[in-house]
Amino acid sequence: MSEPIKNRYDFVILFDVENGNPNGDPDAGNMPRIDPETGYGLVTDVCLKRKIRNYVETLKEDEKGYRIYIKDGVPLNRSDAEAISTLGIDPDLKAAKKADPDIDAKLRDYMCANYFDIRTFGAVMTTFVKGCLLYTSDAADDS
């Protein structure tokens, strides 16, 4: 893969939609998002990122370094588990971190090298902790 980008880049996407809905609001029955003052349609950054992800996925078709991490209907832990397996890391990350303190950097580098959208937009990565948090009203009464 080529040298990573060292600078930050901002971009603007201008497009025109006539008789369409480029970014429906799921909380409002998929109605178009509209600026109440101007009457112009609004498109969120999330929508633009999805359009870019879809374009790159279509153009590159899983080419090395251009895979997409955030896919509709695909759990993120599949890609996380693949990274752990490929790097030969113990799935028990607490034990793995004791053995190798640089494990976070290795995981970050792997994910950035393989996933276009992580490199481009960044990502909040999991801590790979399995399990659930249980909150009960009894716990609130104790405080």
Task: Cite the ranges covered by each PLM segment.
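A generic, well-ordered mixed alpha/beta core segment in the N-terminal half of proteins
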Residues: D80-V129
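A generic local secondary-structure boundary/capping motif
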Residues: M1-E3, K130-G131
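Phosphate-rich cofactor/ligand-interacting catalytic cores and adjacent structured alpha/beta frameworks
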Residues: S143
